[in-house]
Amino acid sequence: MPKNSKVVKRDLDDDVIESVKDLLSNEDSVEEVSKKSELIVDVQEEKDTDAEDGSEADDERPAWNSKLQYILAQVGFSVGLGNVWRFPYLCQKNGGGAYLLPYLILLLVIGIPLFFLELSVGQRIRRGSIGVWNYISPKLGGIGFASCVVCYFVALYYNVIIGWTLFYFSQSFQQPLPWDQCPLVKNASHTYVEPECEQSSATTYYWYREALDITSSISDSGGLNWKMTVCLLVAWVMVCLAMIKGIQSSGKIMYFSSLFPYVVLICFLIRSLLLNGSIDGIRHMFTPKLEMMLEPKVWREAATQVFFALGLGFGGVIAFSSYNKRDNNCHFDAVLVSFINFFTSVLATLVVFAVLGFKANIVNEKCISQNSEMILKLLKMGNISWDVIPHHINLSAVTVEDYRLVYDIIQKVKEEEFAVLHLNACQIEDELNKAVQGTGLAFIAFTEAMTHFPASPFWSVMFFLMLINLGLGSMFGTIEGIITPIVDTFKVRKEILTVICCLLAFCIGLIFVQRSGNYFVTMFDDYSATLPLLIVVILENIAVSFVYGIDKFIEDLTDMLGFAPSKYYYYMWKYISPLMLLTLLIASIVNMGLSPPGYNAWIKEKASEEFLSYPMWGMVVCFSLMVLAILPVPVVFIIRRCNLIDDSSGNLASVTYKRGRVLKEPVNLEGDDASLIHGKIPSEMSSPNFGKNIYRKQSGSPTLDTAPNGRYGIGYLMADMPDMPESDL
C-alpha cells in the first residue's frame, strides 16, 4: 500500500485499515500517531486549538476581550433610540399595559428564536452576513449583500439623528436653555414675540426654525444647514475612529456607551417621580385597555417593534457573534439580550411618561388658570349667575377638584349655551393622550419638560448625552454589519474600508442636512428598511430551516453548545416563525398600500404640521430604496444559477466543529509527517480545493467523492474513525 494514498472513512474503504496499520507499523508509538493527527488540524504546535476556549488555529480573526464586552456590544446595538422614543409611543397608543402582553408573546415567538438563529450562524461559521449565507448556499449569498445595503441606508440617516443630538447637547450648557422662551423680534418702533413661536411653542419653534431651519416642502431644498453639516461630520468622525480600532476598542467603548444610558434613565426616573403629575403619567401609561388587544393593528405594530428592537436582519448581530469563541453559549446570550432589551423599553416608558405626566400637569394648571379667569369674566358680565358657584370655591386660586366641580355645574346650567362659552375641561388625560414619538418626543416634548426641571441644563446635558450613547451603540453594530462581511469576503484592509465607507456616507448624508433634510430622513426611515428587512429575515429563516436543514442545524448547535436546544426552537424555526413573518410581511404591504406615501411638513405661515404627499420623483425614490435594498438577492441567485461566476464555496466550507472544537483544513504541510495521512508528499502539489478533494473512492479509482459530510472537511470525518488514535482535540 503506498503511503501517499488519501484516507477515507473506515466503513467506506478498506484502504483506511491498511493505511493506519502501515503508519502504526512504521516504528511509531500510539502517542506519536496521536501527535500527527493533531497536526492535521493545527499545522503548528504553537497554534494548537484550545478545546476549552474554542479559539481557531491559523485564524487571526479578532475576538472579544471578555464575554461582558460582547454582551454589552449586543445590548448597545439592540437597545437604541427606538427603545426611548418608539416603544413608549406604541405602548400608549395601543392600550397601555395591555400592549405589553402581545409584545411579550411575539418576543417569544419571533424575537428570541430569530435572534438566537442569527447569533448561532454567526458564531457557527465565524463570518459576516455575506460569508454566512454564502456558506449555507452560494445561491443565497445575496441575503448578506442585501443586509449590507439595508445597513448602509439606515446608517446614512441614523447618524444624522446623532448629529441632531450632538447639536442639542452642545446647546445645553446654557442657563436658561435656548429653547426655554420664544425669541423677541425688535424693530425701530417696538419689540414683539416671534409670531411663528407664539403660535406654536418655544421648543417647537427652536426645533423647526433654529435647529433645522426647515423648508415648507421636500421639493424646496433650501441649501445646506451648516450647523447640522458640522454636527454630521463630527458624528461620522466619532464612528469612523471607533470602528478603525476594531472590536477590542469598540468593546471598551461599550462599557461606557452601553451602561451610561441606564444610569441616566434611572436618575431621570428617580427625579421625575419626585415631580407633581409623574404618577398620573405612569398610571395613565399602564392602565390597560384590554379591548384593543383584539385589533390586528396592535399585533402588527408589536411584531414590527420586536423585529426592529433586536436588530434582526441588519447583519450586526451576526457580525458581533462571529467574533465569539466556538463553544460560547449563544442561547443564553439570545435570551439575556432579548429580555434586557424588553426591560430597557419598559424602563424608558416609565421615564418618558413620568416626565410627560409632569409636563401634562403644568399644562393642565395653566389651562385651569386661564379658564378660571374666563369664568370670572363671565360672572362679572352676568352671563353666569354667582348663585351656581359654591361659596367655598375661590376662582382666583382654584384647585383641580374645585375647577372640575365648577365646570360640571356650568355645563349643566348652561347646557344649550355651553358651546359658545369656549370653556375647556382641562383634564390631564387629554394632554397625555396626545401621543408623541420620534424626534417630536426627544426634541420637542422632552425638551419642554426639562425646561421646568430645577437645574435644567444639567438634565438636558444628561439626556442628550444618553441619546448620543444609545445612537452610537446602534451605529457600531450597523457599521459592523457592513464592514465585517466585506472584509471577510473580499479580504480588504478594514481600516481603509472603514474610512471609505464613512467618508462616502458623510457625502451622501449631505442630503439629510439640507433645510429639507428632515423630510428625507422620514422617507428613508419609512421605506429603506421595513419591507427589505422583513424579506431578508424570512429568507434567513428559510435558508437555515429548509436549505441547510433544520435537523443538521440542530446537530451543529448541539456540537457547539454541548447540549441539544429545546424542541421549541425546532418548531419555531421550521413552522411558526416563517408563518408569522409571512403574515407580518403581507400585513405591512397592505398597510403601506392603504397609507398614502407622504410626510408631515412644517408650514411656517400656519406654525403647524401638515401632511403632504410626495411628488412624483419622491415616489420614485421611495420605490427605488425598497428595490435597491432587496435587489442583491435575485441578482446573486441568477448569477449563481446560470454559473456566471464560480459556484465553489470551498473556502467558506473548510471549518467545522466536534463537541465545540474547531477543526480546520491543513495548509503548508510540506515536510510534516502528518502529510502521510493526507497523501501529501513534498513532490506533490497541494489541491486548490482541499476541502472537496480529499475523499477517494475505491482503490485505483480516479473519481473524487465529496462524501456526505464533505462540507465539514477531513477533520470531522477523521475524528470519528474508531481505529484512529484520537488526539486531545
Swiss-Prot record:
One GO molecular-function entry: proline:sodium symporter activity
Sequence segments annotated as region (Disordered): 42-61
SS bond partners: none
SUPFAM superfamilies xrefs: SNF-like
UniProt note: pH dependence: Optimum pH is 7.5-8.5.
Extracellular membrane side: 163-225, 357-452
Keyword Transcription regulation: no
Glycosylation: residue positions: N187, N276, N383, N394
A Pfam family reported for this protein in Swiss-Prot or TrEMBL: SNF
Acidic residues bias locations: 43-59
Keywords of this entry: Amino-acid transport, Glycoprotein, Ion transport, Membrane, Neurotransmitter transport, Phosphoprotein, Sodium, Sodium transport, Symport, Transmembrane, Transmembrane helix, Transport
Residues with Phosphoserine modification: S25, S55, S687, S699, S701
Function of the protein: Functions as a sodium-dependent neutral amino acid transporter. Exhibits preference for methionine and for the branched-chain amino acids, particularly leucine, valine and isoleucine. Can also transport low-affinity substrates such as alanine, phenylalanine, glutamine and pipecolic acid. Mediates the saturable, pH-sensitive and electrogenic cotransport of proline and sodium ions with a stoichiometry of 1:1. May have a role as transporter for neurotransmitter precursors into neurons.
Name the UniProt record assigns to this protein: Sodium-dependent neutral amino acid transporter B(0)AT2
Gene name of this polypeptide: Slc6a15
